[in-house]
Amino acid sequence: LIIDNNDLQFIEHSVQEKIRNDSIDIVFNIYEGKKDLVEKINITGNNVTNEDVIRGELIIDEGDPYINLQLEKSIAKIRARGIFKKVAYNVQDGSKNNLKIINIKVEEGATGEISAGAGIGTSGGTLVFALQENNWLGEGKVVAFEADIDEESFIGRLNYSNPNYNFLGNSINYFIENQSNDKPDLGYENSVL
């Protein structure tokens, strides 16, 4: 946290624990580490997902100081998107002593969902159908449709979500809902969009 808040670079640390009879001594050693830079970031395995979606989750970029903590946070953000089955990385030496090459390998996972349901009760039957795609056109966007139908009403919803709008970490969501009721026994019909 101190490193992130103060924008300190090339900082490394180690923790030493000394256990005694009735106490534990913990020593944090913080020191200036080797001044490595990121030469290149290679991304492989993304056959469906656009590379921009993955790079948009990276905290570390080419030309930045190589800080392992930032790399681990970046990998965690990629995994958190939920569109990859596996995310692995390795770091190798670059073209010079102080340069590092980061290789990120992803394995695409299933991103679509289909669900359906039916129910019968004393007031009639209901059908529900839903579709959702969590990586629409490989752009990391979420598109979902849901329909809820019974004897007297229809509810339809269309949702669109961009979880990393303009690569700023902000989410933007749109949805449209249509609800129609037809109750001939009560003498009215309405529709709401």
Region spans (language model):
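Acidic, glycine-rich low-complexity/disordered segments
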Residues: 1-93, 112, 168
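Gram-negative/organellar outer-membrane beta-barrel architecture
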Residues: 48, 67-193
